[in-house]
From Swiss-Prot:
The keyword Transcription regulation applies. GO terms for biological process: regulation of DNA-templated transcription. It comes from Francisella tularensis subsp. tularensis (strain WY96-3418). Belongs to the TACO1 family. It is found in: Cytoplasm. Disulfide bonds: none annotated. Pfam families: TACO1_YebC_N, Transcrip_reg. GO terms for cellular component: cytosol. Keywords: Cytoplasm, DNA-binding, Transcription, Transcription regulation. InterPro entries: Integrase-like_N, TACO1_YebC-like_2nd/3rd_dom, TACO1_YebC_N, Transcrip_reg_TACO1-like, Transcrip_reg_TACO1-like_dom3, YebC-like. Transmembrane segments: none annotated. This is Probable transcriptional regulatory protein FTW_1073. GO terms for molecular function: DNA binding.
């Protein structure tokens, strides 16, 4: 299990998301709508929808907005008929990157993604070129100061796969993707509110970067996340607290 803290990355990511909350909401609504269209509007029977709603609530989306997105997807609204596509590539320094998209026009999306990679010193790869480096898992992250023993007891009893305590005191709870929402709900019921919770692609081996390369990789990821069709971007870059502070 990779033992790299997500805490520094979370703080940096939240600062960026606060500056572009409207676009984040658009992506979250799209995920809820597609999840409801593919698996139905009952979140108890649809793990993907349950996870999407949990993420939306964590980002302070109103329940009314969430409900409208669920109804839109479950009702078969034609505008909800987008397809999911995944692109893989390499960033500066050979950093592995996965880009998950939802689109109604593959040609437009792949063109935008390829252009962004190329202009940022990377290159778009073929299917499977980097995916083997990642494992899909749920990660529930807690800030320094949480009661480690109590959290560990509750998380393990709820079915967590692993719990990592980092040098800065932050804690990551790892789950099977299918158990993610159930474990998150148990933790919340027991009073453990996380700083971040997501089903993500986690790299077993992280790429260590110097400051210059890290800045270029972070810029590429930011540009990819700004594309309208892009839902999520994953990389194996190890953005340490020191690197993030140096980059600013």
């Amino acid at each position: 299990m990779a033992g790299h803290s997500k805490w520094a990355n979370i703080k940096h990511k939240k600062a960026k998301e606060d500056a572009k909350r409207g676009k984040i909401f658009t992506k979250l609504i799209r995920e809820i709508t597609v999840a409801a269209r593919l698996g139905g509007g009952d979140k108890d029977a649809n793990p993907r929808l349950r996870a999407a709603i949990a993420t939306a609530l964590a980002n302070n989306m109103s329940k009314d907005t969430i409900e409208r997105a669920v109804v839109k997807g479950a009702g078969g609204d034609e505008s909800a008929n987008v397809e999911e596509v995944r692109y893989e590539g390499y960033g500066p320094g050979g950093v592995a990157i996965i880009v998950d998209c939802m689109t109604d026009n593959r040609n437009r999306t792949v063109g935008e993604v390829r252009h962004t990679f190329t202009k940022s010193g990377g290159n778009l790869g073929t299917d499977g070129s980097v995916a083997y480096m990642f494992t899909k898992r749920g990660i529930i992250s807690f800030a320094p100061g949480v009661d480690e023993d109590a959290l560990m007891e509750v998380a393990l009893e709820a079915g967590a796969e692993d719990i990592i305590t980092h040098e800065d005191g932050s804690i990551d709870v790892y789950t099977d993707p299918h158990d993610f929402s159930d474990i998150q709900e148990v933790l919340i019921e027991k009073g453990f509110n996380s700083e971040n919770a997501e089903v993500t692609f986690d790299a077993e081996t992280k790429a260590e970067l110097d400051t210059e390369t890290a800045e270029k990789v972070m810029a590429l990821i930011d540009k990819l996340e700004d594309l309208d069709d892009v839902q999520s971007v994953y990389s194996n870059a190890n953005f340490t607290q020191e690197l993030i502070e140096q980059i600013g």
